[in-house]
């Protein structure tokens, strides 16, 4: 079989992933909920993953890593938690529904939303993005790569705009985490949301 749907989920996982899942099922207890060896083993394993992810994405600290069920949940928590009525948010037409739907919900609550268009080849104008920033703009929210067209957004360029304008930069890296190098400090990303079952080669 030739499998060509890795952007939806990776099918063939490394043996180490399978072994880790089996070990967790057979040995790990409830993390943070007891003093048994099984519970402590789970807690230590979770923190070890925090450390590895912080190093992988160059986060400031392992304590900046939060685990959720998936990227959709991460984006919903981040976007619905960040914005208040009267805030202004900039996003793009390249976004997945996991970005657009919570932003539409925010819009219904009184958040102003600007959705930037792209040209016929799917490319954005970064000059237009910078010009879209207003006094009440709180964040730029964008994907790193479109799951439909494959177009990629220049995160360094967007991060520079966000830093220059003193606003937050939130990235949906569902398609690119584990595939492309992402340094959140260099790119000035305030929130990076991604899933484990695509480029990170983890379970769904």
Label for each model-derived stretch:
Residues 1-204:
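Pyridoxal 5′-phosphate
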